[in-house]
Amino acid sequence: MIKNKVFLIGNAHLDPVWLWRRTEGYAEIKATFRSALDRMNEFEDYVFTASSASYYKWIEESEPEMFEEIKERVAQGRWVIAGGLWVQPDCNIPSGESFARHLLYSQRYYLEKFGKTANFGYNVDSFGHNGMLPQLLKHGGIGTYVFMRPDKVENPSLPTGLFNWQSPDGSRVLTYRLTTSYSDDYYSPERFPEYAGLS
């Protein structure tokens, strides 16, 4: 009998200025990051990941003690910085220069503050993905990418699951398109064995 090992990693997808005012979005980020740190104090094997360098910058500027806790957890490998972008942007309309600057500013920030850069792209809720993203991500030091939208109902022709995504210049990133929404009942405890391939 094959034993499967499943890793559950805490994550928070936040849209701090989509439907909230900036102050509300900031409050959600602060509360989420505080909760993640509290879980780490509670459970020694708890790991958390969050994207968007702008969130870390907000915490650094307004909650320096919390920021130092996050830096310590990143150094321990229990808090994983993700995304490599300043925020999760619209990935269809902006120019290549905009993406290049997203990557430059965020990766530079991560390196200065944490001594490392994000090594996987993370845009679960961005609508559409420019065909040049693999090239841009590669140049930004990112070799893997995770996304959800458009989901398989919105665009069933896109690959689902794990695949290699290639830009016209030949740059490739190992890509994972989430097979279900990050917020539906598929992730309920009752359905977890099915989702994880254990049933």
Protein language model annotation of sequence segments:
Residues 1-199:
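Catalytic-domain carbohydrate-binding cleft regions of carbohydrate-active enzymes
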